[in-house]
């Protein structure tokens, strides 16, 4: 994906959502549960609404330096927040907003991919996909910004799959009269290989498992299917 096309897609997806509700404002709790949460917050000293998965994101391939760079931009924002006590609750799609800053980093990796070929380009695109996935984290179903970020994540992953030497394709898995879309990753196609099936939590995407496949499964001739 060219830099201009990537930028245009981002602008198209987010143009109607610049005043979208900030993620922390979307979850509604039962009165009894809200009381418990309020009491817990009184005893917790946390500065972020989201749980920052620094170790996991680094393991998945994100540079710790880039990660801290994004978090510092979010933390230092002067824009209004849904909750002043939580740094990552900047309202509106602009600088300092969680989704905005991670999308910006993802687009930088897409730009780098345009200057590379083969596996290097694929790695940049898969990293871009991870950034877009984090932009939508924790992937609440009614979060419009997160939904748009997922579109970018899937697009970047698809672009990366076309450049890598490995085979990545979507398949349909029948389940209870329905069909589930899954991503199948194959290190080679000249013979049948064992398959590792992964089903992550609701706060992750199918596109988050690239490094697990490339670094740990593919060298051992293991395929990966992520449902």
Segments (PLM) and residue ranges:
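An acidic- and aromatic-residue-enriched active-site/binding cleft used to recognize and process polar
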Residues: 187, 201-202
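Short beta-strand element of the alpha/beta-hydrolase
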Residues: 192-201
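N-terminal cap/lid segment of alpha/beta-hydrolase-fold proteins
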Residues: 102, 148-188
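Conserved small/polar residues in nucleotide/adenosyl-binding loops
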Residues: 225-227
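The serine-hydrolase catalytic nucleophile loop
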Residues: 203-214
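A short, Lys/Arg-enriched amphipathic alpha-helix followed by its capping loop at the start of a domain
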Residues: 216-222
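Alpha-helical protein-protein interaction scaffolds
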Residues: 52-160
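Long, non-catalytic architectural segments outside compact domain cores
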Residues: 1-94
């Amino acid at each position: 994906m060219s830099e201009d096309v990537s930028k245009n897609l981002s602008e198209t997806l987010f143009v109607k959502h610049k005043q979208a509700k900030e993620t922390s404002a979307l979850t509604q709790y039962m009165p009894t549960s809200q009381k418990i949460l309020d009491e817990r917050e009184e005893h917790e000293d946390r500065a972020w609404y989201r749980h920052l998965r620094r170790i996991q994101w680094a393991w998945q391939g994100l540079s710790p330096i880039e990660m801290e760079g994004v978090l510092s931009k979010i933390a230092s924002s002067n824009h209004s927040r849904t909750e002043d006590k939580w740094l990552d609750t900047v309202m509106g799609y602009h600088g300092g907003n969680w989704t905005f800053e991670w999308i910006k980093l993802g687009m930088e990796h897409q730009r780098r991919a345009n200057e590379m070929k083969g596996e290097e380009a694929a790695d940049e695109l898969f990293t871009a996909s991870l950034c877009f996935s984090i932009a939508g984290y924790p992937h609440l179903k009614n979060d419009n910004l997160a939904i748009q970020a997922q579109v970018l994540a899937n697009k970047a992953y698809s672009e990366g799959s076309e450049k890598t030497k490995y085979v990545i394709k979507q398949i349909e898995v029948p389940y209870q009269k329905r069909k589930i879309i899954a991503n199948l990753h194959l290190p080679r196609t000249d013979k049948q290989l064992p398959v590792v099936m992964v089903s992550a939590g609701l706060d992750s995407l199918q596109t988050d498992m690239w490094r697990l496949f490339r670094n740990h499964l593919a060298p051992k001739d293991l395929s990966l299917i992520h449902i």
